[in-house]
């Protein structure tokens, strides 16, 4: 879509429509939607970088999301410092696993979708509404998912109705599922969830929740080669997002580094991590 000969916006921009940016693209530029692009045949999953492990956990007053920094392409480390946790809007965040390029593009479209709705309606979507919009985006990528290019995000945010955090997971068909307390997606998710089962407490503070998610990513990296643990030589640490009633905040690198140093120092004494009490 370009300006016409007189320098005016095309008619598409001047025609009244709904509050969905995705519907606008579908009607006027469907080729810009990821799911509308045609691909060849065959499994392409080993030919593109993949993001790996994302974890999220709620605490009293909000939710924490953490993502490792490794992207893999088959048995190759494609990138050591990729970022996989992003703000969706002021009160929510999204973490990506699966085909990295498609996932990042989907996150950008999701961010625009939420901003577009807010500008037209003068209010934000409810957290359930945001989760449903992301579900529709994932469903639109089903054709690519069938060829190995799946995008499986994790969505979390602060819900003002309950004054607390909520977590939503998805399957490649766009199915949406609300998770309780904590969840993880990606290749190391089984190990991360197992770790959080032992470490999670409903009474945890935000700082304790951050430490638990870093411990979970460490455990995932310990058993899953596609998940990157803290890179102490390069000082590359997980991306941590915290969402509370004050909005989304990315934890500063220096603060994450201090927690990582503490976790790694303790692992030198106990490599398998902290022991959970038996009662």
Curated annotation (Swiss-Prot):
UniProt source species: Kribbella flavida (strain DSM 17836 / JCM 10339 / NBRC 14399)
Job of this protein: Component of the proteasome core, a large protease complex with broad specificity involved in protein degradation.
Quaternary structure and interacting proteins, as annotated: The 20S proteasome core is composed of 14 alpha and 14 beta subunits that assemble into four stacked heptameric rings, resulting in a barrel-shaped structure. The two inner rings, each composed of seven catalytic beta subunits, are sandwiched by two outer rings, each composed of seven alpha subunits. The catalytic chamber with the active sites is on the inside of the barrel. Has a gated structure, the ends of the cylinder being occluded by the N-termini of the alpha-subunits. Is capped by the proteasome-associated ATPase, ARC.
HAMAP family: Proteasome_B_B
EC number(s) on file: 3.4.25.1
Homology family: Belongs to the peptidase T1B family.
Catalytic activity: Cleavage of peptide bonds with very broad specificity
CDD domains: proteasome_protease_HslV
Active site: 52 (nucleophile)
Protein name listed in UniProt: Proteasome subunit beta
């Amino acid at each position: 879509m370009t300006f016409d000969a007189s320098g005016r916006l095309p008619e598409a921009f001047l025609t009244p429509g709904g509050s969905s940016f995705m519907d606008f693209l579908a009607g006027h530029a469907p080729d810009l939607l990821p799911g509308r692009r045609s691909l060849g045949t065959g499994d392409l999953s080993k030919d593109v970088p993949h993001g790996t492990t994302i974890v999220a956990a709620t605490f009293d007053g909000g939710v924490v999301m953490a993502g490792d920094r490794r992207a893999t392409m088959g048995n190759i480390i494609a990138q050591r410092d990729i970022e996989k946790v992003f703000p969706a809007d002021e009160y929510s965040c999204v973490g990506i696993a699966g085909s990295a390029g498609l996932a990042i593009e989907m996150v950008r479209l999701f961010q625009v979708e939420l901003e577009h709705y807010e500008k037209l309606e003068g209010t934000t979507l409810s957290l359930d509404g945001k989760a449903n919009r992301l579900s529709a985006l994932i469903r639109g990528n089903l054709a690519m998912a069938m060829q190995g290019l799946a995008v499986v995000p994790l969505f979390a945010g602060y819900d003002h109705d309950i004054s607390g955090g909520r977590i939503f997971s998805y399957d490649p068909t766009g199915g949406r599922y609300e998770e309780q307390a904590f969840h993880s997606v990606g290749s190391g998710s089984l190990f991360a969830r197992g770790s959080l089962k032992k470490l999670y407490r409903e009474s945890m503070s935000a700082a304790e929740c951050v430490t638990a998610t870093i411990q979970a990513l460490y455990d995932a990296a310990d058993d899953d080669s596609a998940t990157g643990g803290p890179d102490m030589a390069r000082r590359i640490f997980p991306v941590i997002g915290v969402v509370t009633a004050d909005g989304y905040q990315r934890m500063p690198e220096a603060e994450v580094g201090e927690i990582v140093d503490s976790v790694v120092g303790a692992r030198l004494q106990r490599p398998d991590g902290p022991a959970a009490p038996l009662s």
